[in-house]
Amino acid sequence: MKGTSALLLIGFFHATISQDPGGTVVIGSLSGRKRGNLNTGGQITSNSAILGDVNAGSKLSEPPKRRNTDKTARMLENNPRIGGSLIPPPGVIMEPNPYDINPPYFVSNKNSQSTNSATNTMLQSLTSDTKTTTRTSQTSSTRASSSITQGINTMNRNSMRFNQVDRNKISGFVNSGGQIQTNPLNTNSQSSPILAAQRQITRQKSENTQGNSIVRNGGTNSLNIPSSTRRSQPPNMAVQIGQNTATFNMGTDGKVLHKFLPTNLFENINSVSKEPRNTASVPGIGGMRNPGPSISIRNIFGTNNIEGSSVQLTGSSGVFVSDPGPKGNPTDVPQFVPSGISPTVRDPNALDPFKSIRNQIVPDIKRNEVNRGNSMISAPVIDNPTNSNSMVELNSILQNVQNGFLSEALGNSNNQNNRVTNIVNQINSADPQPVRRCQFLPYRDLRTNKIDRRYFRQLVNGKWLNLKCADGAGFNETTCLCSIHLTGDAQCSPEVRLNFNDGTIQNLTPINVHIDAEGVDASKGWAHFNGSTQMKFEYFNAYDVQRDFLIKLRFKADSYIPNQSHPIVTNCVAGQENTDPSIGVFLTGNYPHKIVFILQTDKSKLLQHLIFDVPRDGWHDITYKYDGSTLTGILDGKEKSLPTEGRIENRQAVLVFGGCGNRIFRGNIDDIQIYTCIPPSHRNKG
């Protein structure tokens, strides 16, 4: 690239980059005004528009001296803290983060405290000689029609490229919203205006760590981040913390997932996933494979950078999560999960957050659109951005880029990898832009006060409904999906469970199941049927059971009617006695009495059945099971089975206990369990 120039695009701005034969990269505006130089091979020069420069080579330069230190201090003092972000997001103010101990300084205008969109936000740079104001375009509605390529291009020590640049100016290092103020973190100069301003602020407000003041510990080494300053509590912000991720929320139409795997961020978080990296995905539920450590930008900037921490960006249309590929592969891209995906049974056509985005929603990524002829990291394209969210996302991307340069500079210059990791992860943990709340809540069992992840809650028409995840999956409030892999019997739980112990007829599972049991008496701890009462489950009305189905119960018959069958449980159609049910357990009235299990599938021409002799008196345990290939019946521990295939035929009927139509049952039923899956404990036996 010697002696050439290339057009860069970041956000809605234009600028040029040129590189002289000596290796100095100059970033400037179309007007020719230089904002700062980046030398990937040596020292960085600076001018009045940049307070401190980042050197990606072997030496960090010190910022130029400023004459008006008092003014600098006042501006620093009066400007809000935005989570210690290197790039203050346009129009978004973040609350102070208690983990934000000593991040690099930045400056923003008080106007940025408003919630105006990025097109109405102005950020004022901090200089003593020149007041430089970055103005966003007044014709943003027109420029918003152009697409933003959201991503991070390949960077190394010989080249620096970005996808989009502000069409008016580049202010500072890499920033589409305003001036970036970056401190050299190894300066001990007593004349540094930053340190002078810091000492003055510290003297005035040594105890104040909240509000809009920027307060530091003071001293020449105040910009170091010792590990001893870690706190044991999570950040004081809207955040949901999972085992390996945190979801930050600030209510601007989305959310950001932040992977904070490094141990230096939270003491109880491991830097490496304990699960196997390539755990096989379980079909039908999606998101089951443990992703392992985040790729972050480590694979982009080399080996001396961030150890496993990254920000996954979002837009109004969904959430990005990480999909690490082979170690060191720099072509991994964020994976996209649409916000409309329900955490219930996954549609086979729905996007899988752990499969390649290129094969799902962006099959035609223009890999060389900006960097023609050169390799670049592919990323989704956001078309027609019309609000500040796109700018917030873009700023977050650019910040990751700058963090990479910062990490590279410190790693090469001081060879303090741990310090680099601490600094960059503190920055990353402080500034993700939360954008959307999860519309579901985990289900908490009020009896045990424990969360049961097999279920989740959704607010529908002002009422909370309890819903069930797909079999084998558990609800994860961080991903807002049923993305947890359950093991053991937790893989399969009953839709309905009744024991009548308290004299009431109530489903003991979290699922909202209406039970019509008028006249059924449960006062003795079981359900009593007198021959004119039934218990109906509308939940299974025309229910498409398909294959897996299991019912367990206990019964005791009081009387029998010769030449008549007594339905204990069926899905028979009332008023259509000539239509056989496709599911049923019957007791015959003739002596010797028998129990009959019946099944009708779409592939069986005849009604399949199993017959057991049953003693006249006493309680009896029965289990009815069909797993798609075998009908199994169990009576008091005795098991019979019949090979059968096909799906259970649907009936436009509810599931009924205690009779159907003119067929009645007199007796007691207890301990009812209904499954639409086969629990592991019943897979190799009845």
UniProtKB/Swiss-Prot annotation:
Keyword Magnesium appears in the UniProt entry: no
Cellular localisation: Secreted
Tissue specificity note: Prismatic layer of shell (at protein level). Expressed primarily in the mantle with highest level in the mantle edge and lower level in the mantle pallium.
Positions with biased composition (Basic and acidic residues): 62-73
Compositional bias (Polar residues): 37-49
Signal peptide interval: 1-18
One Gene Ontology cellular component: extracellular region
Domain of life: Eukaryota
UniProt keyword list: Secreted, Signal
Name of this protein: Asparagine-rich protein
Predominant location: secreted
Region feature (Disordered): 34-73, 125-148, 201-236
